[in-house]
Amino acid sequence: MAFLKKSLFLVLFLGMVSLSICEEEKRENEDEELQEDDEQSEMKRGLWSTIKNVGKEAAIAAGKAALGAL
């Protein structure tokens, strides 16, 4: 009976350790995915600000040209 208890505790302990390792790896993968998403959103923000600046400069140039034509 004592042998069965020890074996059962050993199996449960090893199962818990295995589960803990799997959860840790899962968290690491999720963190990597979040980092990639953050990098992509930073790139999009950078592109958006560039497009916005070009649009502003084009509007200013068009306004100056319109005033110059008057």
UniProtKB/Swiss-Prot annotation:
Entry comment describing in which tissues the protein is expressed: Expressed by the skin glands.
Highest taxon in the source lineage: Eukaryota
Annotated localization: Secreted
Acidic residues bias spans: 30-40
Pfam families: DD_K, FSAP_sig_propep
Residue positions where Leucine amide is found in the record: 70
Gene Ontology CC entries for this record: extracellular region
Single GO biological process annotation from the record: defense response to bacterium
Region Disordered: start-end pairs: 25-44
Record keywords, A-Z: Amidation, Amphibian defense peptide, Antibiotic, Antimicrobial, Cleavage on pair of basic residues, Secreted, Signal
InterPro entries assigned: Dermaseptin_dom (IPR022731), Frog_antimicrobial_propeptide (IPR004275), FSAP (IPR016322)
Residues excised as propeptide: 23-43
Residues annotated as signal peptide: 1-22
Recorded family membership: Belongs to the frog skin active peptide (FSAP) family. Dermaseptin subfamily.
Its job: Has antibacterial activity against the Gram-negative bacteria E.coli and P.aeruginosa, and the Gram-positive bacteria S.aureus and M.luteus. Has antiprotozoal activity against L.amazonensis. No hemolytic activity.
Protein name: Dermaseptin-H3
